[in-house]
């Protein structure tokens, strides 16, 4: 039975298979359930696409997630969002015909650059804010903004930034969002606290990315997930000397408004776009590449703060820690026959 009622086009699905429409070339990437191929249109010679090929057997039980991703991508048409052009639902595989993006990941490109300034970082964040603001205006929350999902469109020096991977995205009309999801280090406090949340979680993630763009290392880091989450929930980060001494006060103010623990007080995308660090000329223009690149290389090598994770399982772990902590406290109270202050659930 087909997963999808129709292709991306307005008419009924054609009888032609994807391989009658496209020539498949090299494998661009491989995931747990899919491969991405370079493909050329047979009707428009030289027009190249990225085709995501998803095995239906591996997809079993996850159909709703894929349907959601396709629904979101069909809804979004923006200069800084990777486009979905077509879908093919065939016997063994589902195919997504996507815009081809060849410029590489954000942080890898910064490391390879010869020079890099605070103003460059401001321009990058502006593009992300414009795209995410467009998503939010259309009722879509990405929920997994991180450097790996920010790609350069091509190899040109002035290439635009593209947002990709909408696998965890959700539309506001699909109900209250409370599912724990995202990536360690980039997830907002309210998600970890299991509170209902909305668009503000994306703004927090942009704040984390902006922080890293200006120093090369993440604002929150710990080998222990429990400690990492405790830092995030409390909003415990610093603008460390000497690395932040060369960064403008305007940039620090901007980040503080994005990484605000209270989602109600946190900037919206429009608020952020109006901040002088984005809309004015307060971003410094001196070269910070040396410092940023050194730290980025170290951070990228660790990969611990980049890995994907099962947030629901992580939160269950934190709940167990809390229960264990409370149990130990009660046992100690009983043995000493005197009150004792509560043990905190987290340790930063």
From Swiss-Prot:
Record note on modification: Phosphorylation at Thr-179 can promote both nuclear export and import, sustaining nucleocytoplasmic shuttling.
Motif Nuclear export sequence, residue numbers: 288-294
Region (Autoinhibitory domain): 278-318
Co-factor requirement: Mg(2+)
Outcome, altering residue 325 to A: In FLP neurons; causes nuclear localization irrespective of temperature
Active-site residue numbers: 144 (proton acceptor)
Gene3D superfamilies: Phosphorylase Kinase, domain 1, Transferase(Phosphotransferase) domain 1
Pfam families: Pkinase
Modified residues (Phosphothreonine): 179
CDD domains associated with the record: STKc_CaMKI
Residue ranges the record marks as coiled coil: none
Protein kinase domain boundaries: 22-278
Catalytic activity of the protein: L-seryl-[protein] + ATP = O-phospho-L-seryl-[protein] + ADP + H(+); L-threonyl-[protein] + ATP = O-phospho-L-threonyl-[protein] + ADP + H(+)
Annotated region described as Disordered, given as residue ranges: 327-348
GO BP of this protein: neuron projection morphogenesis; positive regulation of transcription by RNA polymerase II; regulation of neuron differentiation; signal transduction; thermosensory behavior
Mutagenesis / variant outcome for changing residue 315 to A: Does not affect nuclear accumulation in FLP neurons; alone and
Subcellular location: Nucleus; Cytoplasm
Motif Nuclear localization signal 3 per UniProt: ranges: 297-307
Gene deletion effect: Changes in thermosensory behavior and temperature-dependent defects in AFD-specific gene expression. Decreased threshold for temperature-evoked activity in the AFD neurons. Defects in negative thermotaxis and isothermal tracking behaviors. Defective in thermal avoidance adaptation. Aberrant thermotaxis at innocuous temperatures. Inappropriate dauer formation under well-fed conditions. Reduced expression of growth promoting daf-7 in ASI sensory neurons. Changes in thermosensory response of AIY neurons. Increases response to acute thermosensory stimuli.
Binding site for ATP: 28-36, 52
Record remark: domains: The autoinhibitory domain overlaps with the calmodulin binding region and interacts in the inactive folded state with the catalytic domain as a pseudosubstrate.
Entry's family note: Belongs to the protein kinase superfamily. CAMK Ser/Thr protein kinase family. CaMK subfamily.
Name of the protein: Calcium/calmodulin-dependent protein kinase type 1
Lineage: Eukaryota, Metazoa, Ecdysozoa, Nematoda, Chromadorea
């Amino acid at each position: 039975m087909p997963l999808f009622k129709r292709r991306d086009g307005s008419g009924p699905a054609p009888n032609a298979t994807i391989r009658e429409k496209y020539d498949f070339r090299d494998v661009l990437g491989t995931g747990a359930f899919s491969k991405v191929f370079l493909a050329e249109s047979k009707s428009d010679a030289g027009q190249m696409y990225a085709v995501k090929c998803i095995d239906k057997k591996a997809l079993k039980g996850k159909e709703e997630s894929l349907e959601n991703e396709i629904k979101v991508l069909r809804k979004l048409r923006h200069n800084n969002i990777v486009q979905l052009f077509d879908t093919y639902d065939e016997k063994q595989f589902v195919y997504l015909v996507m815009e081809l993006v060849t410029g590489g990941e954000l942080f890898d490109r910064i490391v390879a650059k010869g020079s890099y300034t605070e103003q460059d970082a401001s321009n990058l964040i502006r593009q992300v804010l414009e795209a995410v603001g467009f998503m939010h205006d259309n009722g879509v929350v990405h929920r997994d903004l991180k450097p790996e999902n920010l790609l350069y469109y091509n190899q040109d020096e002035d290439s635009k930034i593209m947002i990709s991977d909408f696998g965890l995205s959700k539309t506001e009309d699909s109900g209250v969002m409370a599912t724990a999801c995202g990536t360690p280090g980039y997830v907002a406090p309210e998600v970890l606290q299991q509170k209902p949340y909305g668009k503000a979680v994306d703004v927090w993630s942009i704040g984390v990315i902006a922080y890293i763009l200006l120093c090369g290392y993440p604002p929150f880091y710990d080998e222990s997930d429990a400690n990492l989450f405790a830092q995030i929930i409390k909003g415990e980060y610093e603008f460390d000397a000497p690395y932040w001494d060369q960064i403008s006060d305007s940039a620090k103010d901007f980040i503080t408004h994005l990484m605000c623990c209270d989602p109600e007080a946190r900037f919206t995308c429009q608020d952020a776009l109006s901040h002088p660090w984005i809309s004015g000329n307060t971003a410094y223009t001196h070269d910070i590449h040396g410092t940023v690149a050194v730290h980025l290389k170290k951070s990228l090598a660790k990969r611990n703060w980049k890995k994907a994770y099962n947030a629901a399982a992580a939160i269950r772990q934190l709940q167990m820690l809390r229960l264990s902590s409370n149990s130990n406290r009660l046992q100690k109270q009983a043995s000493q026959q005197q009150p004792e202050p509560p043990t905190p659930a987290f340790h930063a």
